[in-house]
């Protein structure tokens, strides 16, 4: 730590809030870690706050990729003058001429130490590695993307501008591995069979204002409505949970209105990383039918044409459900399973995937516990990963805390209902 006093971490927006929590849990030395989220003013204030970080503390700034190249932010990050720059999920800078990639190259050139972290640094295109290594160590593959492409890619197609194949991949891999450390889940013997990860989602300002209004109105109604029952509290929490997922059910309306895509955008990143480019299968659980429908529409847009998604929810006939599960388990082209947690969370086997995303959960611990076992059961040969999409400072966090305590909200919510709002 004597040589590294200031660290800059660049990560996907949903991962940025995880970094301070990880430092708190695992660092055995003093750390001040600030997340650079929110408005431009807030981000600049947080960067400025780190300038006064005590010399005996490691100072860490964590920012999302989409912000790093913005006017004002980029210059402030340069002034921060990090000793170590970390690219978390470094495949986000695989496109050599993207603004965020170019910004990262410049920040990397200023830093003494650099680190990239990725489960899939090379996805569908071996050429993806150049931009990441241009940041990490420009001496490995050189400064010229086009020279690199000429060395390892076979060009063809219209005007000879399309990559139609690759050459000397053994040489490319040898150079890549010369400064890389790779370990699989199977090789990580100290890794638990089940790993849990939280991805935090920011609520847009307009929806946050609406959320706060509904939250305050709910508290007022409960305080002035006489006897508080579990049913009345859960009904109001349900509405807040729907809003956290991006949907609002207006009074008297038959159908919910989509008011935000923040959670869907976070899920989109995961599907692209794990399925589209990682070549893996994925299970997604959601509580509400409109969420399931929205996820299916998202999948239709981003999955390759020869890849499919299936869904299992309450409206599916029971005699059709086995076929849907079987298709996901056996068909290599069926790569995404979207399940309504109350319907698909019990009694089925989904071991074709080793990763499960929770878009939303219900209030029942038993249902949640059962859903964990859909991918973690006999027939699973890999360690399992569970990713929670959580809107910060919302009912999502309260539900997560209750479920981690193995509580059923329907049984505990009456005694201290205000804590859930």
Each language-model region and where it sits:
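A conserved SF2-helicase RecA2
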Residues: 363-421
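Conserved helicase motor
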Residues: 35-44, 65-70, 94-97, 286-290, ...
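SF2 helicase motor core recognition
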Residues: 69-72, 124-126, 292-296, 322, ...
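Conserved helix/coil segment N-terminal to the catalytic DExD/H
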Residues: 42-60, 65-81, 95
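Conserved Walker A/P-loop ATP-binding site and its immediately adjacent core
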Residues: 3-25, 123-128, 287-289
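Conserved P-loop NTPase motor "coupling/switch" region that bridges the ATPase
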Residues: 6-7, 25, 32-33, 41, ...
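Conserved Helicase C-terminal RecA-like lobe
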Residues: 1-11, 77, 190-212, 222-348, ...
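Conserved nucleic-acid-binding Ia/Ib motif block in the N-terminal RecA-like helicase ATPase lobe
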Residues: 10-55, 59-60, 309
């Amino acid at each position: 730590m004597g040589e590294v006093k200031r660290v800059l971490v660049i990560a996907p927006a949903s991962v940025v809030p995880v970094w301070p929590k990880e430092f708190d849990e695992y660092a055995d030395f003093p750390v001040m870690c600030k997340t650079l989220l929110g408005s431009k003013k807030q981000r600049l204030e947080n960067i400025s706050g780190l300038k006064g970080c005590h010399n005996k503390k490691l100072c860490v700034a964590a920012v999302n990729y989409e912000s790093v190249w913005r006017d004002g932010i980029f210059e402030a990050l340069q002034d921060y003058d990090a000793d170590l720059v970390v690219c978390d999920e470094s495949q986000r800078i695989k496109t050599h001429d993207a603004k965020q990639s170019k910004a990262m190259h410049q920040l990397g050139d200023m830093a003494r130490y650099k680190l990239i972290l990725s489960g899939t640094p090379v996805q569908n295109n071996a050429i993806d590695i150049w931009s990441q290594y241009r940041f990490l160590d420009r001496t490995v593959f050189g400064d010229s993307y086009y020279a690199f492409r000429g060395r390892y890619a076979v060009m063809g197609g219209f005007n000879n501008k399309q990559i139609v194949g690759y050459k000397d991949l053994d040489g490319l891999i040898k150079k890549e591995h010369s400064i890389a450390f790779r370990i699989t889940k199977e090789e990580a013997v100290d890794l638990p069979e089940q790993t849990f990860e939280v991805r935090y989602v920011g609520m847009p300002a307009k929806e946050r204002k609406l959320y706060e209004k509904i939250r305050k109105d709910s508290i007022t109604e409960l305080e002035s409505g006489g006897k508080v029952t579990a049913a009345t509290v859960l009904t109001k929490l349900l509405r807040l949970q729907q809003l956290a997922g991006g949907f609002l059910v207006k009074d008297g309306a038959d159908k919910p209105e989509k008011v935000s895509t923040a959670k869907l955008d976070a899920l989109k990143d995961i599907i692209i990383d794990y399925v589209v480019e990682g070549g893996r299968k994925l299970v997604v659980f959601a509580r509400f039918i409109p969420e399931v429908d929205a996820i299916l529409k998202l999948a239709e847009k981003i999955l390759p044409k020869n890849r499919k998604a299936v869904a299992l929810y309450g409206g599916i006939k029971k005699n059709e459900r086995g076929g849907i599960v079987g298709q996901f388990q056996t068909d290599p082209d069926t790569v995404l399973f979207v399940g309504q947690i109350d319907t698909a969370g019990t009694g089925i086997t989904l071991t074709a995937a080793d990763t499960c995303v929770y878009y939303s959960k219900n209030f029942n611990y038993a249902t949640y516990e059962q859903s964990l076992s859909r991918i973690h059961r006999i027939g699973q040969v890999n360690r399992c990963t569970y990713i929670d999409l959580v809107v910060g400072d919302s009912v999502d966090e309260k539900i997560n805390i209750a479920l981690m305590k193995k509580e059923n909200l329907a049984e505990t919510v009456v005694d201290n209902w205000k804590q859930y709002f």
